[in-house]
């Protein structure tokens, strides 16, 4: 009889032993995408025109740094790139400035306008880099300058009464000039790019490419790419930042074929086949700067200005600056000291 006792338990007793089922957590519904035909014109496409008008009104900042030994034509190339005298040539420095004992940082700002769009261009030169007998750690002042610009932006960003538009002095692009030796990269080249590629977008260029034959140029480009790969040096556009397959396909071609750009710069015009062209006069003829059969200047110009300028700015802000910002705030245990200067902080930077 005792064996039948458990079966004689009441429904109430059983309900105490069996836990009530837990309610399922509410799952947020995903928005449903419906491909329906619009009944009429809405005007979504005007956002592009709105953005264009705003950019034309306010303009935009672009800060480019040039690094390399003296005599590689850095200033000439930048002047050719922007078709204006935006960088002072070494010959224009006074006698005392010609050979700096240490690396100096010289930033010159310009406003360039084309088609109603204003670009606030800053060219940052680095005279003295690689020109000393002992060039050990000569990249440090350059890295310090780059980080100082991140710090300035960060302090403005966390300011309680910050400016409506924060002045952007961050370096968006660093053109690193490689000497056209035709052999291999110098230890200084590798050391600089290894350290600085972590904090800025480096675009390597082979200077004065007209001093090499086509075969020498091709072999040197391949050798440079191999050395950068072996030493784990990432140049722009970095593989890890490719957003999609289209980006990867386009950037792979640039990384594997174009980099480093073999360039020639010139601010002199010559008559060629009835046309005025920028070029360099040699005993063998005129080297046309914008002729792809002569050099890769046009590829560099299109890459920096016409196809990747906005991406250079975005990678600077979203990757390099954010990396600095996260480390800075983490090391500081929070926000940096906040300065309150209400009179200055309300000044806008149109």
From Swiss-Prot:
Residues 125-128 are annotated as: G3 motif. The modification Phosphoserine is found at residue 91. Septins polymerize into heterooligomeric protein complexes that form filaments, and can associate with cellular membranes, actin filaments and microtubules. GTPase activity is required for filament formation. PROSITE patterns: G_SEPTIN. Expressed in the brain including the cerebrum, hippocampus and cerebellum (at protein level). The gene is Septin3. Residues 68-75 are annotated as: G1 motif. GO terms for molecular function: GTP binding. This is Neuronal-specific septin-3. Residues 207-210 are annotated as: G4 motif. InterPro entries: G_SEPTIN_dom (IPR030379), P-loop_NTPase (IPR027417), Septin (IPR016491), Septin3 (IPR008114). Keywords: Cell cycle, Cell division, Cytoplasm, Cytoskeleton, GTP-binding, Nucleotide-binding, Phosphoprotein, Synapse. Filament-forming cytoskeletal GTPase. May play a role in cytokinesis (Potential). It is found in: Cytoplasm; Cytoplasm, Cytoskeleton; Synapse. GO terms for cellular component: presynapse; septin complex. It comes from Mus musculus. It comes from the Eukaryota. Residues 1-10 have a biased composition (Basic and acidic residues). Pfam families: Septin. Residues 58-331 form the Septin-type G domain. Residues 1-29, 328-350 are annotated as: Disordered. Belongs to the TRAFAC class TrmE-Era-EngA-EngB-Septin-like GTPase superfamily. Septin GTPase family. Phosphorylated by PKG on serine residues. Phosphorylated by PKG on Ser-91. CDD domains: CDC_Septin. GO terms for biological process: cell division; protein catabolic process at presynapse. Its main location: cytoplasm.
